[in-house]
């Protein structure tokens, strides 16, 4: 339910406020709306890839993206959308994958992977994401959707091994 409240209802209220005050709107979404790709899949997501959300979170983000598109089409709202890959960087919430692993290691707790650790995500630093959003805000075309990524696809086990190495810890 929190995903629906935040991502669907929250987006609705923001869209209505932008419409009421006639301001430009930029909606930040996730690449998770497109579903999953295997690490060795030769295809990449594009702005025209059909949505295939695989979790309540990604479904709620897909719904919010569609609300933005409807407000653009119906009300002429000046808006853009970006779908970004996984962010990492300073001050990230500890429940997120990278800070959770680092915190566990620092506390002497064995890091945990869910499943096999083979699920793949593209990773982008928060500063790079912010720069991309700024480019969209200053140069993007109203009504367009932009994918933001870093071509940094790695599975979770690889990311965890990188963290362990950087922290001087044994992979086992």
For each predicted feature, which ranges?
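Conserved active-site helix of classical SDR/Rossmann-fold NAD(P)-dependent CH-OH oxidoreductases
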Residues: 11-12, 62-69, 73, 99-102, ...
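A hydrophobic alpha-helix adjacent to the NAD(P)-binding/active-site core of NAD(P)-dependent oxidoreductases
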Residues: 3-4
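Flexible, glycine-rich beta-alpha linker
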Residues: 34-35, 52-56, 80-97
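Hydrophobic structural elements of the Rossmann-like NAD(P)H-binding subdomain
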Residues: 26-28, 82, 101
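C-terminal substrate-binding subdomain of Rossmann-fold SDR/epimerase-dehydratase oxidoreductases
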Residues: 105-172
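Conserved Rossmann-fold NAD(P)-dependent oxidoreductase catalytic core, especially the SDR/UDP-sugar
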Residues: 12-55
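Active-site Tyr-X1-5-Lys
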Residues: 36, 52-80, 105-107
């Amino acid at each position: 339910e929190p995903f629906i409240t935040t991502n669907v209802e929250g987006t609705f209220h923001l869209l209505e406020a932008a419409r009421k005050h006639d301001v430009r709107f930029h909606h930040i979404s996730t690449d998770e709306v497109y579903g999953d790709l295997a690490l060795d899949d030769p295809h990449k997501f594009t702005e025209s890839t059909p949505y295939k959300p695989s979790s309540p979170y990604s479904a709620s983000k897909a719904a919010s993206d569609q609300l933005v598109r409807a407000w653009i089409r119906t009300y002429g709202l000046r808006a853009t959308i970006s779908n970004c890959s996984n962010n990492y960087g300073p001050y990230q919430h500890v429940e997120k994958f990278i800070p959770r692993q680092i915190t566990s290691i620092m506390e002497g707790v064995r890091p945990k992977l869910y499943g096999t650790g083979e699920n793949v995500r593209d990773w982008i630093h928060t500063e790079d994401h912010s720069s991309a959003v700024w480019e969209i805000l200053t140069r993007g075309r109203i009504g367009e959707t932009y994918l933001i990524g870093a071509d940094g696809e790695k599975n979770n086990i690889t990311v965890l091994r990188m963290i362990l190495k950087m922290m001087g810890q044994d992979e086992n």
